[in-house]
Regions:
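Conserved class I S-adenosyl-L-methionine
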Residues: 1-40, 43-51
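Class I SAM-dependent methyltransferase SAM/SAH-binding core
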Residues: 52-98
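A conserved beta-strand element that flanks and buttresses the S-adenosyl-L-methionine
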Residues: 109
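A short glycine-rich, Lys/Arg-flanked "PGG" loop and its adjoining helix->strand segment in the class I
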Residues: 123-135
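Conserved beta-strand signature within the Rossmann-like core of class I S-adenosyl-L-methionine
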Residues: 136-144
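C-terminal alpha-helical "lid/dimerization" subdomain adjacent to the S-adenosyl-L-methionine
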Residues: 144-191
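Conserved Class I S-adenosyl-L-methionine
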Residues: 177-213
Length: 213
């Protein structure tokens, strides 16, 4: 079983978009889209873990510019081939933890990345993303809630409390994927010394975290 999450998303690039087609999630996805478009309107945005560009495409409709990054060339290839009418998205391959852009941005977005960060690495994660944006800048993170009977079951947990799912791709390969599902109180506690004006919206399938630094 493959435990390398980079390999998992490389192999999943061609089928990744299917997660956005689930009928029961459309209302929440539209709500998230509206929040992101409003938050990033006329702003410069750094997007981390942009994947196949689902959110890049939507945010670009209102943002001034997006510097979209991912560690995986396979998903970036899919993202680059989408339509961006304002020609305001720049895609580059970067590892978040070694990413040092020449200029800081006004804001930052990360979709479904929190859940793939190990609990013992969260402090470093927030120090890093906070350092990518200008003072008083805005960060928005979204991720999945665990919905009993709907979400892929958690099949493993390590000594730090990180949880893992066993996922099977269409090619039959099995992958043990890090997927944490934090509660709001945990998130607020983790950010209390690193953020201000914390807003947390908890939906059924997703949560939305917004804060300033």
């Amino acid at each position: 079983m493959n435990t390398d999450i980079v390999t998992y998303y490389k192999d999943r690039a061609g089928e990744y978009k299917e997660i956005y087609f689930k009928p029961e999630r459309q209302e929440e996805l539209k709500r998230i889209e509206d929040i992101l478009k409003d938050t990033f309107k006329k702003k410069t945005v750094i997007e981390i873990a942009c994947g196949t560009g689902y959110w890049s495409e939507r945010i670009s409709e209102t943002a001034k510019s997006i510097f979209a990054t991912d560690i995986n060339d396979s998903v970036l290839e899919v993202a680059r081939n989408k339509g961006y009418s304002k020609n305001n998205v720049n895609f580059q391959n970067h590892d978040l933890f070694s990413f040092n852009p020449e200029e800081r941005s006004e804001s930052l977005f990360g979709g479904f990345i929190w859940s793939h960060i190990k609990l013992q690495e969260l402090d470093n994660f927030f120090d890093k993303v906070n350092n990518l944006i200008l003072p008083n800048g805005t960060i928005v993170l979204i991720d999945n809630n665990y919905v009993e009977g709907i979400s892929t079951p958690v099949t493993d947990e390590d000594e730090f409390g990180n949880t893992y799912q066993t996922r099977t791709l269409k090619d039959g390969s099995n992958h043990l994927v890090l997927k944490n599902f934090p509660r709001e109180d945990f998130i607020r506690e983790k950010l209390k010394s690193k953020a201000k004006e914390i807003s947390f919206i908890n939906l059924k399938y997703y949560w939305i975290l917004k804060y300033n630094i």
